[in-house]
Amino acid sequence: MTTKKRECFLSTPLQAVSSLLQVPGVGPVTLERLTQAGISTPQQLVGQFMVLNRSTVAMVSWLKHACSVGGREANIVAEALFAKTERMGVL
């Protein structure tokens, strides 16, 4: 299922994504937990995904353990980041 939020996130250049709330799967609670883990921008979140070698499994695990993000939300975030980096041409 593709949501409007996902479509917007994927079609917007990363530099123009100004809030973590624009990332699919990120709501107010997840935003607070990411901020507590030192992630305050969408660019930092993509950077963390890149550090984890663009592995959705590793990203889900990191979100669950480092940020206490629920499994459903973690999967949505990881899949959106994978799709975003694919569109950016990152190998």
Regions found by a protein language model. Give the residues of each.
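C-terminal extensions
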Residues: 1-91
